[in-house]
Amino acid sequence: LLGGLIFGAANKAFEADNPNANGFEWLSRDEAEVQKYMDDEYCGFVPFPASLGELFAGVGTSQDKHQIRDIPQELPIYVFSGTADPVHNDLKNINRLLNAWRNRGLTTTTKFYADGRHEMLNEINKEDVIENLIAWLENLSFRR
């Protein structure tokens, strides 16, 4: 039941056009990467309810104004995501987080990849994702 609630909702949009859906299409458009995930004994398990509670508490903490206040304003923040990641609800969830950070005066750099799903480092365009991340890292400058 819990597995269906967690993974089923995430995969729903990708099952409509796929009679052979395996339940994990939401992770990536790269079928080989999805298969690796399915074959890995440490992936795809249903977390304990307490673990989920901690995960959801962390999501709330990431947007809590008192916690955000403690993030150094000079800390560079890079956020990347696929536009088809169901976890972000059409980017609404991630934009809510970004707005909370920006309202605090934090500087964020964002990169959204069209049609990308949940695991952008395992997507069909992962080379671009990695290249953009490395370019951002190489352009950082820190004051000492």
Segments from the language model and where they lie:
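Conserved alpha/beta-hydrolase "acid-adjacent" motif
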Residues: A84-R96
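Alpha/beta-hydrolase-fold enzymes
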Residues: L1-Y42
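Active-site nucleophile elbow and catalytic-triad environment of alpha/beta-hydrolase enzymes
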Residues: P47-R69
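A general structural detector for well-ordered alpha-helical segments in enzyme core domains, enriched
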Residues: N93-A100, V129
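Catalytic active-site module of serine/aspartate enzymes centered on a nucleophile-bearing elbow/loop
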Residues: S62, R102-R144
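Short beta-strand/loop motif that positions the catalytic acidic residue
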Residues: V79-S81
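Short, conserved loop/helix-junction motifs that constitute active-site signature segments
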Residues: I68-Q73, R104
